């Protein structure tokens, strides 16, 4: 235990004395709402033009907004929503915005209850838990719908309902929620509802009834990925608020932007790279943030993302991954799908796991490749046909640590697996 008791700050003193890096790191976080959104004026103007009828108490068209992660969809919609509420206050009309995160609020009951309970203070508090007026469970859904309708009627005006990550709601609960919301205007006399759906997944509309899709997608807006120069502008804007003047080497922002541009133009990734670079420089008490800190940040973020990804895999996928780890421990840097299948079957037999077919194992290998956990390539073996080879791109100690957290794979019997017998099989 440390005996650093020389000041009230004790253990933390050395981490608080270096003020050469950050001025306000919070502006680099995803939940920060900038006053200016670079390179999104066309999309913001389009959303505003669609919602403008709300200011004259008319019903705006419903909007579906698409785009990859980190393309400014949510920030732009929130910005327009705030401006709409401000303009409505000046115009003497009533416009309310309610923003729901459908990754959290992913059932019809919770969506309807959240909207109804949030009408009085629709956008003043986070919308990640059901409010107090309607119980979290217990009412029939049609009663919740009726309560929402009554609340809307008594409130009057125009309500814009933003369903962020709408695809998560549809995939979990179907399209009943959207069916009810898109037809609610026909049940209202004194209020009007407009829906904005935000999605990273263009294909989620395949799950929708054609009538729902037709009502929901009256207007569609696509947010393209940012390119490297655009990401530079975004980072420069935030860096001026986040960092002490002169703390960043001139190569840092262009490098963060270039790396994030390779990741589908993701502004969140660019901001994470810049923030983590600064944090690493801060922790080592450096005088500034250099290119090496960006490289270190990239490696750290990729490792953290991989750990999270692997930890959520089903046991069968982890068993396939564990088979690859065993092959690597046997000295094989590159291994085939056939070899993975042999070792996987040994693992499945030992821990009483249902044995998958070779075809299904190949599918799981493709998924691991798509997630970036492994690399694969298909090679031709002439008259013997084609096979898939795979290998790990980085050190596997962290991967093994995460895989063996699964109780089924943290099995003493697996530690006694006869590796020599397996080696003999592959000679």
Curated annotation (Swiss-Prot):
Keywords: ATP-binding, DNA replication, Nucleotide-binding. InterPro entries: AAA+_ATPase, AAA_22, Cdc6_C, Cdc6_lid, ORC1/CDC6, Orc1/Cdc6_arc, P-loop_NTPase, WH-like_DNA-bd_sf. GO terms for molecular function: ATP binding; ATP hydrolysis activity. SMART domains: AAA (SM00382), Cdc6_C (SM01074). The keyword Calcium does not apply. GO terms for biological process: DNA replication. SUPFAM superfamilies: P-loop containing nucleoside triphosphate hydrolases, Winged helix' DNA-binding domain. ATP binds at residues 71-75, 226, 238. The keyword ATP-binding applies. Gene3D superfamilies: 1.10.8.60, P-loop containing nucleotide triphosphate hydrolases, Winged helix-like DNA-binding domain superfamily/Winged helix DNA-binding domain. It comes from the Archaea. PANTHER family: CELL DIVISION CONTROL PROTEIN 6-RELATED, ORC1-TYPE DNA REPLICATION PROTEIN. Involved in regulation of DNA replication. Belongs to the CDC6/cdc18 family. This is ORC1-type DNA replication protein. The gene is cdc6.
């Amino acid at each position: 235990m440390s005996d650093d008791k020389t000041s009230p700050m004790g253990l933390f003193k050395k981490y608080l004395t270096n003020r050469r890096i950050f001025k306000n790191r919070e502006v680099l976080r995803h939940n920060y709402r900038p006053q200016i959104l670079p390179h999104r004026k066309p999309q913001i103007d389009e959303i505003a033009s669609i919602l403008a009828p709300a200011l004259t108490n008319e019903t705006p068209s419903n909007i579906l907004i698409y785009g990859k992660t980190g393309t400014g969809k949510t920030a732009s919609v929130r910005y327009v929503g705030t401006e709409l509420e401000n303009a409505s206050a000046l115009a003497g009309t009533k416009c309310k915005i309610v923003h729901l995160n459908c990754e959290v609020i992913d059932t019809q009951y919770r969506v309807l209850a959240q909207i109804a309970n949030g009408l009085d203070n629709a956008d003043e508090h986070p919308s990640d838990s059901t409010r107090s007026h309607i119980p979290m469970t217990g009412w029939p859904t049609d009663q919740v719908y009726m309560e929402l309708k009554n609340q809307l009627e008594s409130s009057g005006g125009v309500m814009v309902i933003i369903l962020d990550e709408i695809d998560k709601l549809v995939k979990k609960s179907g399209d009943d929620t959207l069916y009810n919301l898109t037809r609610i205007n026909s049940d209202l006399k004194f209020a009007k509802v407009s829906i904005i759906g935000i999605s990273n997944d263009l294909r989620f509309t395949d799950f929708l009834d054609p009538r729902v899709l037709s009502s929901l997608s009256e207007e569609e807006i696509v947010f393209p990925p940012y390119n490297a120069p655009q990401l530079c502008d975004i980072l420069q804007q935030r860096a001026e608020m986040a960092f002490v003047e002169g703390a960043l080497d001139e190569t840092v922002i262009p490098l963060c932007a270039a790396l994030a541009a390779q990741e589908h133009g993701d502004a969140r990734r660019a901001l994470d790279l810049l923030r983590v670079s600064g944090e690493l420089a801060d922790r080592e008490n450096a005088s500034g943030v250099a290119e090496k800190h960006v490289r270190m940040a990239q490696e750290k973020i990729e490792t953290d993302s991989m750990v999270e990804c692997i930890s959520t895999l089903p046991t069968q996928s982890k068993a396939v991954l564990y088979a690859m780890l065993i092959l690597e421990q046997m000295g094989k840097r590159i291994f085939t799908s056939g070899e993975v299948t042999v070792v996987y079957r040994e693992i499945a037999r030992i821990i009483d796991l249902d044995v998958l077919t070779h075809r299904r194992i190949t599918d799981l290998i493709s998924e691991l490749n798509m997630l970036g956990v492994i690399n694969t390539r298909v090679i031709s073996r002439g008259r013997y046909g084609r096979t898939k080879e795979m290998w790990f791109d980085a050190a596997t100690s962290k991967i093994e640590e995460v895989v063996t957290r699964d109780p089924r794979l943290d099995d003493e019997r697996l530690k006694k697996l006869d590796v020599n017998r397996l080696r003999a099989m592959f000679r």
